[in-house]
Amino acid sequence: MRRRALMLMSIAAPVLGIANHGHAQDGSKPFTPEQLDQMLAPIALYPDSLLSQVLMAAGYPLEIVEAARWSKANPTLKGDAAVAAVKSMSWDTSVKSLVAFPDVLTNLDSHLDWTQKLGDAMISQQQAVADSIQRLRAKAAAQNNLKTTPQQKVTTEGSGDNVQYVIEPANPQVIYVPAYNPSWVYGPWPYPAYPPVYYPLAGAMMSGFFWGLGFAAGAAMFSSWNWGRGNAYVNVNVNQAQNIDN
């Protein structure tokens, strides 16, 4: 993320105000709630920090490609060690952070049409994206598929019709990436014309929910959703982000 963007996001500015990369929808119709749920289904249950950085990075698809190539050329580097190794790269901070998670980066690189849509949606419809994330999390919770585990801590904010689901790593220094089949984890899918996207991570089961190894990547996490101030707001730890670049 560019330095100016970091400073603005640190005071909870909407993503639209600081991350317009010039390709958002280009005058076409906005994505519908059904389309957003479809494209966000594979990642809505990621920890908040990782999810926000994936969506930021999706706005830089060419850099995603370059970072994925670097990751494939350096297969022994993962977690914070990988992030430290790309400090000198000119990529956005969010893209650099994803080299900590090779499978996540590979998924974004292998399905660039999906990645482009994620980036477009985050740039031009950030509130709708946040609403979709919470809608999907509520579905998973209703199926008893979103709960606190040794890998993650799940809490809620708000009450009544305004409950927000917060997902954090159980250990802030060790990040686990869930792999799951959206058709299973969310229960009956309400939009037959828009089945959920499913790009399983390496090693994931064809159905159900799977935890792989945790990554020592606490230093790579610099953002989170500020659900309490409106779903579309993302908080950035400026010092943490600058440590990735410098």
Feature-to-residue mapping (PLM):
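Bacterial N-terminal signal peptides
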Residues: M9-G17
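N-terminal export leaders
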Residues: R3-M7
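N-terminal non-cleavable signal-anchor helices
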Residues: L16-A19, T155
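Low-complexity, repeat-rich tail regions
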Residues: Q125-N246
